């Protein structure tokens, strides 16, 4: 019981009502229940799932562009963070649709089920987002999906318009960030995670490919292709 109220006090920093906290807890319980059938979260994290998953996702709510009509969760999985954020946005009476991209049939079915039960303003795309083009969104969020350089490439190539990209970074986050800035130009701010000393959040804007390295890469590809043709 003490842990329950401790978690509520953490979320209270984001002006979360008791009713909404209860809804978040119900969502957490549904994840654990469904986890017996499909792999939604690590079994090691179920005992601390409120802090490890729900609060961890909720902490980015203040980074969401509330002036936009949509937010996009790429690689949504169990709805972390998409469903959590949708619940919080409704609590704050913010009119925004949450688009969730998850190519797994079983996980997408779970997302549809909880969205319907909690009456959330979501749209579930059971598709491979890497195959989508000219996407438009306000904020884009992603957690435990792909390495940062891959995510930057996806957003730069597949989204024609967006406000910001919010990325959850883990233990090797600093190393991935160092690798990313070698090939990409982008504005970013770091935010310390509330749930782990080893983690942090990135709020990214204006992603651009570093064209010098990109041209060298393209030149290398052309040389390889030319070499193949000469061998034929």
Locate the predicted segments by residue.
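Conserved SAM/SAH cofactor-binding pocket of Class I
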Residues: 58-142
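Conserved beta-strand signature within the Rossmann-like core of class I S-adenosyl-L-methionine
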Residues: 162-172
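Residue-level signal for inorganic ion chemistry
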Residues: 31, 85, 169, 204
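Active-site capping/gating segments
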Residues: 172-232
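Class I S-adenosylmethionine-dependent transferase superfamily signal
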Residues: 85, 155-156
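Class I SAM-dependent transferase core
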Residues: 1-66, 72, 105-120
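A short helix->loop->beta-strand "cap" motif at the edges of active sites that frequently abuts
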Residues: 94-96, 160-163
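A short, conserved alpha-helix within the catalytic core of class I
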Residues: 147-155
